[in-house]
């Protein structure tokens, strides 16, 4: 009888683990407002409004259990990610916007909750690559408030956009 009980417990546990689907959630934002006084500067810092928005993003993510924070290697994306990363005691991991959502990235982030800070022309593209469809167009150059949330549960992918004003 003891053997059958253990066998039944093993089978039940195995079946339960097979039906449990990992959830992966990506939060994708564009960097906050940047200094625009020097149009030749390809790597500007955040302006005062941008610094405030970056702080607000940190507040937004306060109660969300992030596992990782990614940003491109630009001042404005690093500065946008910084308050959230500091609040979560996480390093900011750099990613190449020309190599978005690779197999390696998908594997490393599977089952995790991740913040990705990019640009107006990379954030929607990144979301589209995760989704495997062309759902979103490039963002307006003045849109620093959109938050793309992409969730993967098993093979099901969903997404939505929220606005943080």
Regions from the PLM with identified roles:
Residues 1-4:
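Positively charged n-region of N-terminal signal peptides that target proteins for export
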Residues 6-10:
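Sec-dependent N-terminal signal peptides
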Residues 14-17:
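C-terminal motif of bacterial Sec signal peptides marking the signal peptidase cleavage site
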Residues 20-107, 123-126, 133-165:
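Active-site-proximal alpha-helix that buttresses catalytic centers in soluble enzyme cores
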Residues 26, 110-118:
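Generic beta-sheet signal
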